[in-house]
Amino acid sequence: MAYFLKQSTYSRGLYLQIYESYHDKNTKTSRHKCYKKLGYVSDLINDKVSDPVSYYKNEVKKLNDKRNKELEEMKIKKIGEDPTRNFGYFIVKDLYNTLELEKELDPFKYMCGFSYPISSLIEALTYSRIINPCSKLKTFNEVIPYLYENYAFSLDQIYDGLNYIGSEYHKFIEVINYCINKKYGRNTSTSYFDCTNYYFEIDFESDDKQKGPSKENRPNPIIGQALLLDGDAVPLNMRMYPGNESEKPKIRELIKEMKEQNNINGKTIQVADKGLNCGDNIYDALIHKDGYIFSQSVLQLEEKEKKWVLLDNDYEEVKDNEGNLLYKIKACVDEFPIRVSNEEGKKVIVNVKQKRVATFNPSLANKKKIEINKLVEKAKGLCHSQAKKEEYGESSKYVKFVDEDGKKASVLINQDKIDKDLKYAGYNLIVSSEINMSKHEIYRVYHQLWKIENTFRVMKSELDARPIYLQKRESIYGHFLICYYAIALLRLLEEKVYKDKFNTYELIDLIRGFKLLKGEDKNINLTKKTPNVTKLCDMYKFNADYMYLSPKQTEKLFTYAYKVK
């Protein structure tokens, strides 16, 4: 097997392609296939490449040197090769089959010009991400080779493919959405939105890696990720953006894109936390005949509204079965002013009719008061030790730095701020366009936001989404597209296939736990028997708990298609 530069003469000129030779097991002869189309020599000449033929001959030499090195490493590795294989990803592969994703992704091979199907690469990277999230180099060496099925990609093909899907990530999201809509439909009566960001261990900004407000309070450059979920908590859309951009406009962009791509004309209620609550987002939802349920900071309300929140009048107590107070809730409907941008970009005041739902949670109040008192104690200690301003961190909000006529600033405890925060601890406010929705329903819908927070948690912890080893923007976006596919398929399994019989964490444990020793005529199942393994096998009559699995029995696990009810 080797690469070579193919030179073809046409009427327009000399056309270059990199070809790959390989051994055909069926015909037992050497064959060739296109690895990469380069183009006409006249089009390839630029400031950096004066002689395309010589340049790409050198590139081919690099490819061959790299392949030879990989082959040598594989020979060394074969001495102690582990026959253990993971086959648990059949759970996700069967959903991939059900959605017919391979068929819908197949046309991309005509667009990208690769010699391998892009669908197979996405499959291999998605399954690998769920099984063992790690760098692409480690995925190539230590994860893909130990999948039960054979996914034969070179490291260069993985990087090239990742770069391509990153450059077109919105199209790949459109494809999986089409497949989900076709098989399962979508609940878009409500949509949940939130943003997060990921930091990079670099000092200088580049591309979309820009310095901005980090969710982890780090000074490093970050990249932003906006995520939209449907009413069943299955991902609907994703947008990556530079770390120095505001997250507030992203909800409008994603809702608009989601409706256009899925031909949705009906109303969707946008649900988001106070970070996304601004006049422009509220006004945009209303003019597009959508609704919204946002939280709002009680501390930023006008004084008369704060008084209404604190008044005990009209609060209804909600208790558990043992009579313990869970929370108090009340609501009002009125016209409230919001600031929106007009056509000239200037802010103007517009009155909108809103339902406002105030709540008081005693356990949250106790938690907040403990946090406030800890910060106050820290601030007092730093005051006594004459610490520098930057050492205060979050506790700085409870001190005042007073400059005494050009002399060194003195530090005073801000008792007014402390008293204010303690007074409003445990109180929350939700604002909504849904006048006719009950206060309890608004409260319930808003608190489903934990699902999107949990989605980010799964992506960051279980799928290890932070792209530590990637630098190019397209490769980073490709990495997040793989994470998006992984979480979308897992959520779909949880909500639509298994109907909450397994949560996402349990599904990941199941997938990682199914292992076998691969043999010639039989496979030995190494999977530990657990209640969830038994439940899964009983539900779908899978034979994945047998001690011995023939190759035919094992392969059958990967060809199952879930019934769509």
Residues covered by each model-derived region:
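Short amphipathic alpha-helical "interface-anchor" segments enriched in bulky aromatics
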Residues: 442-469
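Secondary-structure transition/capping motifs at alpha-helix termini
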Residues: 25-27, 146-153, 184-187, 231-234, ...
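Acidic, metal-coordinating catalytic cores used for nucleic-acid/nucleotide bond scission
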Residues: 246, 270-280, 298-300, 474-476
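An anionic, glycine-rich sequence signature occurring as long contiguous blocks
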Residues: 223, 237-240, 290-445, 512-565
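Short helix/loop capping segments that flank catalytic or ligand/cofactor-binding pockets
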Residues: 26-27, 134-140, 150-152, 200-203, ...
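Electropositive, glycine- and tryptophan-enriched low-complexity nucleic-acid-binding patches
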Residues: 218-259
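Dynamic "connector" segments at or just before major functional cores
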Residues: 1-207, 227-244, 527-565
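Secondary-structure capping and boundary motifs in well-ordered enzyme cores
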Residues: 118-119, 131, 154, 184, ...
